Amino acid sequence: MTHSIRIGTRKSPLALIQTNLVIQQIKQFVPDINYKIVPITTSGDLIQNKPLYDIGGKALFLKEIEQALLDKKIDLAVHSLKDVPGRIPEDLIIAAVLEREDPRDVFVCLKYKSIEELPQNAIIGSSAVRRKTFIEKIRSDLKVTVFRGNVDSRIKKLMNGEVDATILAYAGLKRLNAFNPQYCHLIEYSQMLPCIGQGVIAVEIRKDDNAMLETCNQINHLTTFELIKPERAFLEYLDANCRTPIAAYSKYLDKDNIETDFMLGNLESSKITFHTETTNIKTSKEAGIKAAKIMLSELER
């Protein structure tokens, strides 16, 4: 039997690369598959001159794709998990993830190797409030300016001198073969916790599509799927948006236990709080919710 799958994705070079990685995985288990990539322009792609938190948040990168899924114009959607809100339409599910790439951020700068080395009042291009929060924690004198666009366009803006530096995700740079050690420098977790789900490619389907669910079960990287549960539970409980400084990073302590570092901030009060939870994989979601409750309480003091 020949399968035919319509795969929805954004039009960016990175999104198309990630979609092809999903296709490669599916072909290992369903070799006779026919597939059609359906590139979709999202609202987030169209509006480039404003910060995401002013126009509706990262959900704008999913809205049109999820609608196509609900309308049965596509069979599955491929996303960067970091762009997926904690709460998605109830008729859809994240049915699979690929193995997580290194989720660290990268300091991209032509002259300096770290945020600390930048000259006084230097300009860093970044539209993410998470990154802005960490940058200001490290160097309060630096100016953080709105910096939108795909990876290639942001690097070009940097090369053209529009900013002194920017921060990008290592996973995207690696997949685009754009990590250049001459001007790309990894930032350690101790200095900047990653975005929730960073480095993970996610597959979203309709909840009632049993055929697609069976396919997704075959490609799902279970250790990554378990690893992101406390991060996603934290995000879902807080129903956080792009105005909320939020971060989390999970790692395995052994095959049954996960440690997750969380960060939550409040832009109005400029408060930031950190918390760590260690949990068995069977209760990892509860750990994310517990962390959210503790940290909300700390911010309210």
Swiss-Prot record:
Cofactor(s) annotated in UniProt: dipyrromethane
MF (Gene Ontology): hydroxymethylbilane synthase activity
A GO term from the CC aspect: cytoplasm
Annotated GO biological process: protoporphyrinogen IX biosynthetic process
Pathway where this protein functions: Porphyrin-containing compound metabolism; protoporphyrin-IX biosynthesis; coproporphyrinogen-III from 5-aminolevulinate: step 2/4
Residues the record lists as S-(dipyrrolylmethanemethyl)cysteine modifications: C242
Protein name: Porphobilinogen deaminase
Native organism taxonomy: Bacteria, Pseudomonadati, Pseudomonadota, Alphaproteobacteria, Rickettsiales
